[in-house]
Structures are given as structure tokens and as C-alpha cells.
Swiss-Prot record:
Domain C-type lectin: 116-223
Protein name: Putative C-type lectin protein A7
Compartments, record wording: Host membrane
Statement: the UniProt record of this protein carries the keyword Transmembrane helix: yes
Chain segments annotated as transmembrane: 23-43
GO cellular component annotations of the record: host cell membrane; membrane
UniProt KW Cell inner membrane keyword: no
Mode of membrane association: Single-pass membrane protein
Keyword line: Disulfide bond, Host membrane, Membrane, Transmembrane, Transmembrane helix
Encoding gene, per UniProt annotation: A7
InterPro entries: C-type_lectin-like (IPR001304), C-type_lectin-like/link_sf (IPR016186), CTDL_fold (IPR016187)
Lineage: Viruses, Duplodnaviria, Heunggongvirae, Peploviricota, Herviviricetes
Cystine pairings recorded for this chain: C137-C222, C198-C214
Amino acid sequence: MLAEMLWPAVNMLLPRKALLVDIFFILAATNLMIAAFALGCLAFYKQLVYITIGNLTFPHQSGDEVIRAMYIPPVNDSVDFNPGFRLSWLNTLSPLSDGPYDSWSQCEICPGRFVGQKACYYVPPKTYSFQNCFFACKNISKCFYLYTPQNITDPFFDHTLRDQDIWIGTFFKKLNAALSTIDNNFDYTAWDELSVYCAYLTRRSRSTVYFTDCTTSKLCLCGQEDFTPAPFYEALTPAPVHG
């Protein structure tokens, strides 16, 4: 008798309980969708503002921004960026105003193979690591140093970069530092930043590019500026390459 009296009330509660369960699952599913959407947006944002090279991640910056310091997480001793140890040789390099390069009278005549608009260039036939290019250029002539070109539209680069990339004398001496060159003279507004200490020119792009492995062998751009070219060396200027 009691069961018969309570059964209508139970029947009235069952739909309400089912409705509450449905609402709970709907809310839970909605929250999951919102969370998934937020994570997707975050991943897309990181894809836009970060670039990953191997297991190193670097903030991506537009080319015309001023170079900012970047943190590189340690990987292992063989590839870790440790300017205090591995780049100590860069800290010993002196600018031209403090060095022996511009004190040699014979530097007034270009001893190199090619003469550009203002610079005298020489490219050793062998390839070297970025570090060894500094010494290769110095060993060829007291006039030469690993050079950073001011005019990469010079026909010389059409001739030289046809086959290979070439190291140039642009580098970081340490983290949290500005770019440096031996002659303290460069005027670039666009760079590819990979937060490494070496830079090169490539046949694929007229922009200067940073390279992740500075021990790789490439050609070296040895050069000097502010000289008086002799007629013999002027005749060696390469003709523009078309096509």
C-alpha cells in the first residue's frame, strides 16, 4: 500500500534526476571544449613566435628589430653555448684602431684578388670553421681580417656565392651583448637570429644568416677597406653576373 502511494512521487523525481545528470555532462563537455580550444590557440601562438632547432627553442623576432639576448637551455658539453669558455678567443680580438692591421703601409695597395667599390677582398681556396677563418685571413696578409661587407650587392658576391656559403666577420662576443665586427663598421638592418655567435652569407639569400654549427667548414671572406687600389688590381674586379 505504501509503495503504491510513493510510486507516483518517484516517477516525478526520475526525470528531474536525469535532467541534472544531462546538465552535468553538458557542462563538463563544454569545459573540455573550451580548454582544448585554449590549448590549441596557445600552441598556434607559440608556433608563430618561437622557432625550434633540434631540442633548442628560440624566440622568433622580425628581421628589422634590434638583436636581443636569448637564453639557450643547456644541452650537453659538446654543443652548449658557453661564451666564457668557448668564445674566449673572440674576447682577445682587437678592433682595427687598436691592432696592427692599419699600421702597415703596404695595406694602401690591395693585395687581394678582387676589388669592390671600397673594399679589397680575398677568398682562400680552402674552407675553414668560423674561428679558423680569423686566423686564415690574418695569415694571408697583415692587411686582411675576416671582413663584414657593407655592400652585399657588389658583383663580387654574385661571383663568389654562386657555389658556396661564406663566413663573414660578424659575431657575438658573449651573451647579452651587441653584435661585433673587427672594424666596428657595419650597417645591417635585417638578420636571421638563431642566437649563435657566427654569421655567414649564403647564395640563397642576400641577408646575413646566423648558423647553428660554427665549426662547419665554409669559405672565408677576407678583406679590408680604405685602400688605394693599383691599376693591376682594379683590372681583377669581376664583371657582373646576370641571370
